[in-house]
Regions:
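Hydrophobic packing residues in well-ordered alpha-helices of helical domains and bundles
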Residues: 16-23, 51, 100-107, 133-136, ...
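Extended aliphatic helical segments
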Residues: 13, 30, 51, 102-105, ...
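Sparse, context-dependent recognition of short Cys/His-centered cofactor- or disulfide-binding micro-motifs
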Residues: 4, 18, 23, 34, ...
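Short, contiguous alpha-helical
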Residues: 2, 40-86, 119-158
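Alpha-helical bundle segments that constitute or directly flank the non-heme di-iron/ferroxidase center
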Residues: 4-38, 60-70
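Short amphipathic alpha-helical segments at helix-loop
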Residues: 7-11, 43-46, 92-99, 128
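Amphipathic, well-ordered alpha-helical segments in soluble domains
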Residues: 22-29, 61, 110-113, 117, ...
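Acidic/histidine-rich alpha-helical segments that form the ligand environment
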Residues: 87-127
């Protein structure tokens, strides 16, 4: 166990730190908006996404990572050969009609559970690091530039 409480080496501590810093940037941007602004379509245009849809999307990926990390820890993990586009469509549909509060709570809970599973791994490996990056820092990076622009646009309308 490292001084920071992580059972992993430096590369893995870096993965957690990257996840943390990007998550807090993302959430800081979201908190700059009113609940009504979070429901405004336009974050993406085709298909039309709101910030609620973005948080629902991120939250479902975090929840999926939690499941995969559980399987890694239990020795039942079968690899990450998956159809990302199909999962994105499935996750978007699952969260599409959820209220803002549900999408927000689900994203925060998904992240918390994913991190709990990460820290509970008895034998962390490259697959675990792949999931923490795919669902966390790397995934947030895919969305942060557009979110910054969209938040600036929404705030500018006030």
């Amino acid at each position: 166990m490292t001084a920071g409480g992580s059972p992993r080496g430096i590369a893995d501590v870096d993965a957690i730190e990257s996840e943390r810093s990007r998550w807090y940037e993302l959430i800081g941007l979201v908190r700059a908006l009113s609940p009504e602004e979070c429901l405004e379509p336009g974050y993406y245009r085709d298909p039309a996404w709101s910030v609620r849809d973005l948080l629902g999307h991120l939250g479902t990926w975090l929840a999926e990572a939690e499941i995969q990390l559980q399987q890694i820890n239990a020795g039942t993990y079968e690899g990450h050969e998956l159809d990302i586009d199909a999962l994105n469509a499935e996750f978007l549909e699952a969260m599409r009609d959820q209220p803002w509060d549900v999408a927000s709570v689900q994203a925060h809970a998904g992240r918390t559970r994913m991190l709990q599973e990460w820290h509970g791994l008895t034998e962390p490996d490259d697959e675990a690091t792949w999931w923490i990056r795919k669902s966390g820092a790397d995934h947030y990076d895919e969305h942060l530039d557009r979110l910054r622009t969209w938040v600036e646009e929404l705030v500018g309308r006030r």
